[in-house]
Amino acid sequence: MSVFLLVHGAFRGGWAWQRVRPHLVAAGYDVHAPSLLGAGERSSYAGQVRGLDSWVDDLAALVLAEDLRDVVLVGHSQGGLVTTALAARLPERLRCVVHLDAAVPRPGERGIDLLGAPAVDPARDLVVPPRPLVAGDDLDERTAAWMNARLCGTPVAPSLDPVPAVPAEVPQVFAFCAGTPEGYPSRVTRDRRAAAGESDVLLECGHDAPMTAPDLVAALLLAAARSPHDIHQTFTPISG
């Protein structure tokens, strides 16, 4: 049976999946939702993050140590940088990659380039502080407050490294959130793919879907685990 490896986005930790995880476990799946180095309960180690490989090495070690196979690898938001690079590292271990409102640069592009390449790169040791979330749309005040208490800074170094291509043999599912604002890296990814005529899934929810729409996210992930090539039999595709 497949196993899920869930990778959170910027400023968050493994806790970001806690509302999705029970649905996957109830369906009989093993689920791993680690906090990246320097995030969540590991935020005090942010200074050890030297680049994208710091995160990829960390997750690859988990996959190999636990001998995970047939992995449904899920990256949300900035987590898309990590899952894309991990897929290039360990394609033989994967069932598929699910890009959930994820920042996915073109091969060889950097995460920071999705924001428009800066004239001068920020210092690699910079840790960007989080901005408090504001309730609105599908993010209620209680959830926003709970998340704000757990947000942490995000090392910028991984966003300064080029991201490799996902090998062609690894199936990919792209799902975007309708409520994601213009300018978000994941929105840039969505708009690029739409302009190229790609057929992706659009979820009617905000960017923090794992917290605000866990039932919907779980349904997407379970459908991907069953048959990533047939995702559009369950979720209506959108295209440019």
Residue ranges of each PLM-predicted region?
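Flexible "cap/lid" loop of the alpha/beta hydrolase fold
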Residues: 88-94, 98-130, 183-192, 235
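Short beta-strand/loop motif that positions the catalytic acidic residue
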Residues: 174-176
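Short, proline-enriched alpha-helix->beta-strand connector loops that line the catalytic pocket
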Residues: 166-172, 196-198
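Conserved HGGG/HGGXW glycine-rich cap/lid loop of the alpha/beta-hydrolase fold
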Residues: 2-43
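Active-site nucleophile elbow and catalytic-triad environment of alpha/beta-hydrolase enzymes
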Residues: 148-166
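Gly/Ala-rich beta-loop-alpha elbow adjacent to hydrolase catalytic centers
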Residues: 74-79, 83
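Active-site loop/oxyanion-hole signature of alpha/beta-hydrolase fold enzymes
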Residues: 30-71, 88, 114-117
